[in-house]
Amino acid sequence: MSTGLAYPPRLADGVELLGELKDSGFTKPPALIRRADGQMIQISRLLYLVACRIDGTRALDAIAALVSGDLGRSLSASQVSYVITDKLAPLGLLAGGAAKAALPTASPLLALRARATLLPAAAANVAGALFRPLFHWPVIAAVITAGGIMDYWLFMLHGLSGAYRQVLGDPVDLLLVAALSVVSAVFHECGHAAGCRYGGARPGRIGVGIYLVWPSFFTDVTDSYRLGRAGRLRTDLGGVYFNLIFMLGLAACYAVTANQVLLLTIAITHLEMLEQLLPFVRFDGYFILSDLVGVPDLFARIGPVLGTAFARGRHTRGEMLRRPARRMITAWVLCVIPLLAFTLGSLLLYLPAFNRSLWLSVNNAGHLVAGDIAGRQYAAAALAAIGGALAALSSAGSVYVAVRLTRRAAGLVSRRTAGQPRRRLIAVLGAIVCAASLVLFWAVHGQFRGW
């Protein structure tokens, strides 16, 4: 045993053993462990069995004997020592070790950044418990039926022309639509928390962060991985389900007040629901697809799936998936790679022009705010300020995405060329050529003008 680890070995404080991933799309389902910092870790069955037998009192020989019985094959004390010191300890799962060593954490592609908490885990649990009865099947059936009736009346009988005329002519109404949309988004997150709680898991905090270039709300529902497929899908769909409930509440308010602003908010919420169901970025649709196939992080499977396609008989990580899951993920990869390549490629190619337009919008918003305040048009000033803030945030987000992509590419090249100076030199020269070509493209297309 390493002298830095506690002996007899024991798990670090706050480590939870969650068991095997249920309804997994892997040929050999991984086991799940959650650290005290909330990081969810997938490990093999062998590592999980060793972790289960570590209790702070057993010596290596005793652990080896118990794990051997669990596995049905012999495991020596030295092999257990290797698993503990070389596999479990680096993941931060054992007490002792380097006291202040940075724990490894996931850094998924296109993840939410700059997170801030709106509701702590305790409050999110209370909200989940409060709204939990809304997931009883009779309630779900009633909500969906009422939603269908509402949509038929709104889009087929009543229409939205009156709502557009009222809202576009009054900045106060526009502000009200924006405020109601924010409330709808927060209620959406309560739906995820309630779905998680209904299945028997514990939701974490509800907060807000930056996704790509725009602000986005989130709910920590990592504990739902202890649930089966149905429980995880309930958690995923809880957000759009609560959007539907929110729209029914707005329709009821319209029946009392006849305020057209409420109808336009209902229409906008429909668009938000459709956006959430897109499976190509980390919206609800992405997690729905992920839980349908039983693979937690689809973006992490892009490389293995491509490796399987071009392996020419070699064993790859893509073969760890069951055939139905592999087929579904392959179809998803074939759709998402061109979309992301086009989107992120366009961002890089037109980054200066994009940011110049955004900062012109920020500047114009500043003038509008000053003029509206001088004219005592405070609602219009608030709208202009919100628009300017969103433009500035989009600019900062676009630069952040570009920098992050560059850093990930540099890290990948560094790892692939480690110990190979010739290949690294070629990679560096290639990077210089690409950077110079990009700057030349910007210059030729006049993207530096006006700065």
Over which residues does each language-model region extend?
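Long, low-complexity, charged/polar intrinsically disordered regions in eukaryotic proteins
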Residues: 1-35
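Long, charge-rich, low-complexity alpha-helical segments
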Residues: 36-131
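Core alpha-helical transmembrane segments of integral membrane proteins
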Residues: 106-208, 249-252
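Alpha-helical transmembrane segments
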Residues: 148-154, 343-350, 393-410, 437-445
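Membrane-interfacial helical/loop segments at transmembrane boundaries in membrane proteins
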Residues: 160-164, 353-378, 450-451
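Membrane-embedded catalytic scaffold of the fatty acid hydroxylase/desaturase
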Residues: 169-320
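Cytosolic-side transmembrane helix boundary signature
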Residues: 398-429
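Internal/C-terminal transmembrane anchor helices
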Residues: 417-447
